[in-house]
Design a protein with these regions (language model features):
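Bacterial Sec-dependent N-terminal signal peptides
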Residues: 1-21
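Short beta-strand edge/turn micro-motifs at domain boundaries
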Residues: 98-123
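Short, aromatic-enriched amphipathic alpha-helices that serve as compact interaction elements
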Residues: 14-29, 36
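Short solvent-exposed beta->alpha transition segments
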Residues: 37-74
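Surface-exposed, charged secondary-structure patches
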Residues: 59-97
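Alpha-helical elements of Rossmann-like donor-binding domains used by nucleotide-donor carbohydrate transfer enzymes
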Residues: 20, 32, 56-60
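Exposed acidic/polar residues on beta-strands and adjacent loops within beta-sheet cores, strongest
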Residues: 31, 50, 74-82, 120-123
């Protein structure tokens, strides 16, 4: 019976859900976040733009997470707009700084794709 329930949960669980993305952002898992990238995704950290394949974008996030002693991720606001675009405003905080985070995602069929992932230090 346990096997049937587990199979049922795994079958209906969407591995590309908005909740999973938020969890990945909270735990700073670049590898999990990369599941939401495609060839058009871009990351902007303090005005420096990074584009490329998933590996390059993942490396950019890894570097940011490694260089900054982040403690907390907090969502400020999220919503949707026209054409299946979802946006999220959030903050990462460290011992010394607060980073503003802005994400735009495209909901394409049953998958979310990060279009833009922007991080700026709050002054």
């Amino acid at each position: 019976m346990k096997t049937v329930v587990l199979c049922f949960i795994l079958f209906f669980h969407n591995p590309n859900s908005l909740e999973d993305l938020i969890t990945s952002l909270e735990i700073r898992s670049s590898e999990e976040i990369s599941n939401y990238f495609d060839s058009n995704s871009k990351i902007i950290i303090n005005e420096k733009v990074s584009k490329g394949n998933k590996f390059q974008l993942t490396k950019t996030l890894d570097n940011f997470f490694t260089e900054n002693n982040l403690r907390e991720f907090k969502i400020i606001h999220k919503g949707d707009s026209q054409n299946n675009i979802i946006y999220m405003l959030a903050e990462y905080s460290s011992n010394d700084d607060i980073y503003k985070v802005f994400l735009t995602l495209l909901k394409d069929e049953k998958k979310y794709i990060i279009q833009k992932f922007k991080i700026d230090i709050r002054e």
